[in-house]
A protein has these predicted regions:
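Well-ordered beta-strand positions
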Residues: 36-39, 63, 112-113
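Low-complexity, flexible helical/coil segments
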Residues: 80-84, 124-127, 145-150, 156-160
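Cysteine/selenocysteine-centered motifs that mediate thiol-based redox chemistry or coordinate metal-sulfur cofactors
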Residues: 147-178
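The feature represents the first ordered module of a protein
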Residues: 47-97, 102
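Charge-rich, low-complexity N-terminal segments
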Residues: 1-59
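Generic structural motif
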Residues: 32-37, 69-71, 119
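Compact, glycine/acidic-enriched structural inserts
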Residues: 1-12, 113, 119-120, 126-149
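Conserved, surface-exposed functional patches that form binding/active-site neighborhoods
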Residues: 83-134
Length: 178
């Protein structure tokens, strides 16, 4: 590992999802209560409140292991709404033998989807800096880029509509407000 890691660079963020305890341990080690977990053949649905955040009051996410994605719909507080419709993290997802504990490792790249209009890729600089700092190996970085390109291509081919693309790759997530 490089001894001169820029201050904005961090190791890959890890989250835990414990279905039996109904908790989500975030990347800072804070344990959050989960309102709902739902396991489907293609992934895990997570719904929880976001406490003590001035802009966001809740979230729904789908962990999609075969796609290497976490797709999130944020619920913004009044006056803090954003144009984005889905936030996609490129992740590695591990599931324990019981299927009751899921783990994500964030691979820095994020995609912001404005349904029917566009998708933006964020944090490419963080990915590259993490590789240079020895926090992520090149094979993992290449896999993250391939996942990002595949996701961009799928979204573009389906009019930037997540709900049209995901079923073509075996995932049919449902959302509480869509």
């Amino acid at each position: 590992m490089n001894a001169h890691i820029p201050p904005h660079i961090h190791p890959p963020k890890v989250e835990l999802f414990d279905l039996d305890a109904m908790t989500n341990t975030d990347s800072k080690g804070i344990v959050r209560e989960v309102r709902e977990y739902r396991v489907e053949p293609f992934g895990l649905y997570v719904a929880r409140d976001v406490i003590d955040h001035r802009r966001i009051h809740a979230l729904e996410s789908w962990l999609l292991p075969e796609l290497g994605l976490r797709v999130t719909d944020w619920f913004y507080r009044p006056g803090h709404e954003r144009e984005e419709h889905h936030y996609i993290d490129v992740v590695r997802i591990d599931i324990d033998a019981s299927g009751r504990c899921w783990r994500t490792q964030d691979h820095y790249l994020d995609l912001v989807v404005c349904t029917g209009r566009s998708v933006d890729v964020l944090d490419t600089d963080e990915l590259l800096d993490a590789v240079l700092a020895g926090l992520l190996d090149s094979a993992t970085a290449q896999a993250a880029l391939a996942t990002t390109y595949r996701t961009l291509d799928g979204l573009a081919r389906h009019g930037y509509r997540l709900e049209r693309w995901l079923p073509t790759v075996g995932a049919s997530p449902t959302w509480s407000r869509r």
